[in-house]
From Swiss-Prot:
Primary enzyme class: transferase
A Pfam family of this chain: Reovirus_L2_4th
EC number: 2.7.7.50, 2.1.1.56
GO CC, alphabetical: viral outer capsid
UniProt organism field: Reovirus type 1 (strain Lang)
InterPro entries reported for this sequence: Ig-like_fold (IPR013783), Reovirus_L2 (IPR010311), Reovirus_L2_4th (IPR048604), Reovirus_L2_6th (IPR048603), Reovirus_L2_7th (IPR048602), Reovirus_L2_8th (IPR048294), Reovirus_L2_GTase (IPR048601), Reovirus_L2_MT1 (IPR048598)
Protein's name in the database: Outer capsid protein lambda-2
Lineage: Viruses, Riboviria, Orthornavirae, Duplornaviricota, Resentoviricetes
Subcellular location: Virion
Amino acid sequence: MANVWGVRLADSLSSPTIETRTRHYTLRDFCSDLDAVAGKEPWRPLRNQRTNDIVAVQLFRPLQGLVLDTQFYGFPGIFSEWEQFIKEKLRVLKYEVLRIYPISNYNHERVNVFVANALVGAFLSNQAFYDLLPLLVINDTMINDLLGTGAALSQFFQSHGEVLEVAAGRKYLQMKNYSNDDDDPPLFAKDLSDYAKAFYSDTFETLDRFFWTHDSSAGVLVHYDKPTNGNHYILGTLTQMVSAPPHIINATDALLLESCLEQFAANVRARPAQPVARLDQCYHLRWGAQYVGEDSLTYRLGVLSLLATNGYQLARPIPKQLTNRWLSSFVSQVMSDGVNETPLWPQERYVQIAYDSPSVVDGATHYGYVRRNQLRLGMRVSALQSLSDTPAPIQWLPQYTIEQAAVDEGDLMVSRLTQLPLRPDYGSIWVGDALSYYVDYNRSHRVVLSSELPQLPDTYFDGDEQYGRSLFSLARKIGDRSLIKDTAVLKHAYQAIDPNTGKEYLRAGQSVAYFGASAGHSGADQPLVIEPWTQGKISGVPPPSSVRQFGYDVAKGAIVDLARPFPSGDYQFVYSDVDQVVDGHDDLSISSGLVESLLDSCMHATSPGGSFVMKINFPTRTVWHYIEQKILPNITSYMLIKPFVTNNVELFFVAFGVHQQSALTWTSGVYFFLVDHFYRYETLSTISRQLPSFGYVDDGSSVTGIEMISLENPGFSNMTQAARVGISGLCANVGNARKLISIHESHGARVLTITSRRSPASARRKARLRYLPLVDPRSLEVQARTILPSNPVLFDNVNGASPHVCLTMMYNFEVSSAVYDGDVVLDLGTGPEAKILELIPPTSPVTCVDIRPTAQPSGCWNVRTTFLELDYLSDGWITGIRGDIVTCMLSLGAAAAGKSMTFDAAFQQLVKVLTKSTANVLLIQVNCPTDVIRTIKGYLEIDQTNKRYRFPKFGRDEPYSDMDSLERICRAAWPNCSITWVPLSYDLRWTKLALLESTTLSSASVRIAELMYKYMPVMRIDIHGLPMEKQGNFIVGQNCSLTIPGFNAQDVFNCYFNSALAFSTEDVNSAMIPQVTAQFDANKGEWSLDMVFSDAGIYTMQALVGSNANPVSLGSFVVDSPDVDITDAWPAQLDFTIAGTDVDITVNPYYRLMAFVRIDGQWQIANPDKFQFFSSSTGTLVMNVKLDIADRYLLYYIRDVQSRDVGFYIQHPLQLLNTITLPTNEDLFLSAPDMREWAVKESGNTICILNSQGFVPPQDWDVLTDTISWSPSLPTYVVPPGDYTLTPL
C-alpha cells in the first residue's frame, strides 16, 4: 500500500473500461430541461450533512451561463423559494423559444450548448436575449457558429481568430444559509462569477499556438477524454480563492481537486459491464508546469490526477457527499510531509499510462495519452470494497515485531504525542441493584456476647476514608438509592420463617408504619418503595393493608421527632429508615444514643407478635450491647441485612416476634457476618482512595487513568519510526488494557487517536521491560475509513463486567496474592495475552506455557520471561524448567475437553508432569463442585451422569471431578503435601485488581461469579507442607476429628472461615464454632482436634510454629451441609376440608423449608395459609396443605431458605398436587390459578369466568374467609360437589 505524501492509496487498481456514446443535445432536450419536471430538474440540491438543510445547488446545462454577480439575478436565498422562482422563469423562456422554433419543425435539431447556457443566463438577469435566439440551433459547428460576429452578441463569448473564449459559468449556487461550515458541501470555486475561462478550437494544435503567445502562469488545464462541447483548455483565475482550512487554494487547484476526486470515486464504482460518460474525469496540466514546484498543491494534485487516470484508488473512501471538513483534511494530507512512492510522475504535454494499468483511455482517445511499456505498476486489478464510517472507536489489538527501541525513547515520544492532560468522563465503578448479604438467628450457632463482636473501624471518620466513601458514592450508577435498599431489605425480611409455626413472620395485609419517610424523592412526595409495595409489585413481597408515614420530612403522614415518645398507634410491621447522621453527625456517642431511642420507638409502635426493621448507620458494640440487653430478650428471632449499594458500614436490623419473651443471643453467625462486613468496607475504602477523584483532570500522575496519543496525518512514511515508537510506548504503558482507535478529521488534519488505560497491573508489566518492543503498524495503516472519536471514559462498561470476567478477576487476585518478589513462576495455559505478566512482581522469572502462540514480544525483558508453545499435558518437556510456583487458571478443564480426557485423567497427567519439576506450590483452578450441585441458569449446566460442565454462553463443555478424587491423586504423588481449597471471601478483596484496572462491576455478575466459583475453585497444593488427617467426612452439626502430626506442644493452630478466625487452639473458649477441643499427645507428637461446626463451607488451617510464630499452611477441609435428600409421604386418604392434609416430610432438620409456586418462570412464595410446616409430637417435620382445584394447574415446590440463595440445596417438586383425583361428592375449594381469565366448567359446561371484569360468583358459591390460593390476593370459593375443570382464556 503506497503513499503519495500524506495520501494513502489502496493496494489494487480499478478503472472504468466502457464509455457511453455521445448523444447530441436537441431542441426537445432543451425544452425538457426548461420544463424542470420533478425528478428531472437541471439542478441538484446539496445539503449540510449535520443539519440536513439545503445550503447550495449544483447547476447543469442549460443553467451554466450565470456569469454575472448574483445580485443581477434576484434569486431568493431559500431553496424552496428559489426553485419556485426558477421554474416560473424557465417556463416563460420555453414559450419564447418555441415561438421562434416550433417543436414540430425543430424537434431533433441540435442545440448549441454555449448559446443555450448564455440564453438562460441573459434571461434570468433580465438582459437582452433575443439576439441569441438565431444562434440556438447549430448551423455549422458550435464553435464556428460563434466565431466572428456571433461572439460579439454576449459577454459570454470572445473571439481570438480560430479560438473561442467562453466565460466559465457557475456550476454551483449558494443559498443564503451556506456559511462555509465544516459540514457544508465544497463548491470548488465554481460558485464564483469568474473562476475560470475556457478556450475552444477545433484542434488542440490551434489551442497550443494560441497559448504560445499568452500568459499561462496560472496553469492551463485540459480534459483529453471527451472534452465537453469540444476541444478546450481551462485557465483558472488566480485571484479567486477558496478556503480549505488551514489552506487557501486558488481556482486552478480547486478544479484539479474536484476532477481527480471524481475520477477516484469513479474508479471505486467501476464495473466491467457498466459504461461511464467519460473514462477519465481528470483535468491534466497542459501548460505552465514550469511555474509550479514539487511542493506546490498544483503539482501534487497533478500527480494525483495522473494516478487516478491510471486506476489507482484511495484507501480512504470518498464519501458520497463531500463536506468542507473532509476536503480540508484531504488537502492537508496532500500537503503533508512525505514522498510520492509510486513510479508515476506527470508530464506536461501528455498523460502516461502504465503498461499494466486497467485504464483503456489511450485506446478510446487518440490524443493526450501514451502507454509506456517499460512503466509497470505491478498491482492487482480489483475495485476497492469501501467501508462505511464507524460511529465510535474500535478496539485495536497490537502485534509486535522483533524490532526494539529504548524504553525511555518510547516515553519521550508518548510525551510528545500525548493528549494529556484531559478531563475524561468518569463512568461508573459499580452498576446494578443491591448486592445483598444477610445473616439470621440460628440456634445451632455458638452464643457470642456483644463484646466479642467486631468493632467499627476507629478510622471511619478520618478524612481519607470519607473521601473514599464519597468517591464510591459518586461513581456508583444507580437510581433512587433508598428504593434499591428498601426493596432488597423487604425481599429478605419477607422470607423469614417462624420455626414454631412454619409461617412467614411478615405476611400480606399487615398494617405498616414507615419511620423516616421523606417527601424529597425525585418524582414522588413519599419513599419510592411505598407504591410498588402497596400494589404488590415487588417480587416475593406481598402488599400490606396500609402504610402510614412518620418523620421530619413527610408529605403524606405526620411530622414527628421519632427519637422521642409519640402517640403512634400499633402496627404489625414498622419499617425505620431514619438516618442517625442527621442529628448525630460523626459523633458515635450521639448516634448510638439515637439508635437506642429509635429502637424504643420501634418497639412501642410494633404490636405484639409483629416485626420491625431498623437502619443502623454505625453498628458499634454500644449498639449491639443495647440490642443484646433490651431487644433480644423481647423478640423471637432477628436478621441482619447489608444491602450493598454504596460503600459504608450501614446495616439493617430486623426483629421478629416483638414483645414475646425469649432467650435470644448474638451468635457466631453474626460474628462471621460482621467480620466480612467490615473487611468488605475496608477493602473497598482502600481501593477507592487509590482511584483518581471524580471529575479529575488526568495528567498521567495517578496510578489508574487514561492514556491517549494522537498522530496527525499519519502517513507512516517519514514519520514511521517515530510513530511506531510512540504507539509502542503507549502499549507499554497500558499493557493488556483494551485499546481503542479513532481516525477522523480535526481542524483540517486527519488524526489517528489511540486511547487506553494505565493501571498498577500495566505498570508491573512495563517494569519488566528492558527494551521497548515495537508494534507492527500495518493493521493501523490499512485503516482507510473514518472511525469517529468519543470522549474517553475511565470506567466505560455501562453494563458492568460479565460474570466470567468477574470470575477471572477472582482467580487473578489469588495468583497475584500467592507470588512474592523473586519467586520463579511456571504458568500453564497462559493464553496469548499473557496476563500473568501483569499479576506477578516484575522481579519474578516466569515461564509461560500454552499450546497457542503468544501475542507477546520476546527478548525485551529485564528478567527471564520465556514463552513455550506446547501441550503442557505432554511428557518430557518440563525437564530443566524451573518454577517455584506453578499456576494454572481456567485451562485444565479446556485441555481435558480438547484431549477427550476425564478431568481425573487430565489432573493425574498434570500431577505426573509436575512431579518432575522443582515446584513447591501449585495453584490450579479445577472443575470440582465444593457445594451442592445446582445449575446456574444461563451460565453453568451440570450433567451429573456424565460429569460434564456445560457453559451455554460459550457453547463449550468440560469434564469435572470431585474433591476426594483430586485430593487422592495429589497425596499419591506427594504424600506429605497440604491441600487448600482456596475459599472465596465475601469481603470482595478480589475487586482491587478489577477496580484499579478500571473495570466496572455489576452486582448481578458478582453474585453469579460467586456461585460459579463454588464449582470452579482454586486448589492450592503445598508439596512440602505438613498434612493433617481428617477422620471421615465433616458434616454440619456432627463431631469432626482432625489429627495434626509433626508439631510441638507450644505450637498454635488457627482455623479461618472466609476472612474470620473461627477458632484458635491458643484459646478454644473464644472459638466461634459451637464446640472445639484440642489435645497434644506427647508420645505420638501429634495434635488431636474435635470440633462441631454450624456453618457449611471451606475452613483453612494455619500453624504458628515456634517462638517466632512462623506461619505454616496446613491446607483446608470442607464442612458439608447435611444430606439434601427429601421425601414427601402423602396419606392414602386426602382431606379436602379446611383442616387440610398432613404430609410427612423426611429431611435433615438442618434445612428450613418453604413452599413456592412457579408462575411464568418466576418463583413466588406460596401463601402460608395454604402451606404450613411444623414439628409433630414425635419430632418429625409435617407439611399441612389445604387442597384447591387450582392445584392441578400449578407447579408447587418445596425449597430451602437455608443459604444465601433460596432453593440452592433443596428444590423438590410436589408432583402429587398435579395428579390428585378430586372427589365429586363433597364441597371443594376453588381459586383462580393466576391473574388470567379462567373458564370454570362443571361436567363440561361453562358456569362462570374467574377474574373476568365485574365477576359475580354463582349463587351457590361461598367466599372463604381466609384464602388458600397460592396468592393471598386471589380469593378462594367454596363450591358445591361436582366434576370441575379449569381452562385459561
